[in-house]
């Protein structure tokens, strides 16, 4: 649940939210995957990977390795040198966080009258698009590729700790924007450790009049043995209008219980 969490370039004195239009004509705002990645890396305190612009482009320094810098282990890199380039695809993949409620062209009128009055100056005017909504996004982690890059492989205990630190960050994620701190802690979460590396539940959270489509989630969960056996569902009570249906249909646990179970499974995977 967030409010006006990612702005684009804007036009004149109008700050525009990042948004997209679906075929039905409804407009939805989104938080870009790059913005989410920035917040995750910052809050994990792994935003210390050295960079340079020796090749006329800012990129990670050629001598950085995944052993020393978890950021490029999790989110990949491209290093360009005179002899060619080295690429590591992201092992932790993010989707955009797309609003579940449509944008209705609300705007906020702004001025700097308080400052201008101090020196008898004219105040400047501006407008910002505003939107408060629940957002849905997907994180996919390839556990087999964590901590492995060419001839480098870190200890399994370190692989486990990196993923656990990532899960802790996601559970309590927040975002600073324009003087606000937006709480991005998950209110509903579904996932698990699967045999197939498939984001089964991506784009499967649908909201109607603040009611979550529990039947759709159940149908995905029951679609194959992988999801039937390995799916965990967590939620925060008091958010959705059809809470009784959610409990009856999905049998969720608390968000805290879900993340605790996920971390236990990660430790077991790397044991």
Language-model-detected regions and their locations in the chain:
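RNA-binding basic/glycine-rich loop and surface signature characteristic of RAMP-family CRISPR effectors
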Residues: 1-271
């Amino acid at each position: 649940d967030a409010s006006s969490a990612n702005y684009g370039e804007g036009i004149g004195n109008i700050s525009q939210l990042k948004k997209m239009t679906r075929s039905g004509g409804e407009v939805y705002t989104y938080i870009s995957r790059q913005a989410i990645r920035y917040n995750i890396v910052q809050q994990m305190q792994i935003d210390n990977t050295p960079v340079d612009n020796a090749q006329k482009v800012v990129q990670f320094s050629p001598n950085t390795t995944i052993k020393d810098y978890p950021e490029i282990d999790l989110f990949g890199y491209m290093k360009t040198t005179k002899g060619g380039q080295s690429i590591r695809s992201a092992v932790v993949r993010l989707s955009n966080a797309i609003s579940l409620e449509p944008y209705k062209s609300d705007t906020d009128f702004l001025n700097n009258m308080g400052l201008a009055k101090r020196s008898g100056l004219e105040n400047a005017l501006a407008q910002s698009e505003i939107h408060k909504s629940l957002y849905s996004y997907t994180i996919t982690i390839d556990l087999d590729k964590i901590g492995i890059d060419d001839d480098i492989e870190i200890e399994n205990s370190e692989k486990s700790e990196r993923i656990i630190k990532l899960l802790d960050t996601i559970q309590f994620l927040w975002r600073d924007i324009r003087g606000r701190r937006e709480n991005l802690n998950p209110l509903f979460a579904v996932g698990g450790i699967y045999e197939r590396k498939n984001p089964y539940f991506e784009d499967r959270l649908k909201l109607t009049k603040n009611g979550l489509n529990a039947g759709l989630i159940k149908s995905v969960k029951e679609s194959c043995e992988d999801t039937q056996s390995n799916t965990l569902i967590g939620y925060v009570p008091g958010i959705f209008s059809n809470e009784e249906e959610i409990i009856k249909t999905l049998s969720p646990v608390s968000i805290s219980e879900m993340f605790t179970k996920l971390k236990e499974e990660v430790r077991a995977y790397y044991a």
